[in-house]
Amino acid sequence: MLTKSLEGRSLDLLTITVNSDREKIEEKPVIFLSARVHPGEVCSSFVIHGIIKFLLDSSPYSRKLLKNYVFKIIPMLNPDGVARGHYRFDTRGMEPYGLTVHCVIITCGQNKTYKFLLWVIK
């Protein structure tokens, strides 16, 4: 679990790669993916599920990707909005994407974490 949403739902971060040597993992480039920024983007759940399934497959294509990259995946970035049946907004009726840094730091736990993670993996 990466953090909790404003309503206490888990915001998960999956890390998928191959290699038992931590130093080698830290040298790999990171590919960051997320889904359900806007709750109504239902198709993104199917896409991210397919990507995860593909990466966990034993095909030579997925093995090559995992050998060369670390995948960081947040399958559902706005779990509160999804649970409430919102189309675009979060728990408070606010736009979860593209908020100012001030707003993110003060009020939006999941977005603060998301933007911080993007900053860290640059």
Task: List the predicted regions and their residue ranges.
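Active-site/substrate-binding loop(s) of hydrolase catalytic cores
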Residues: 2-122
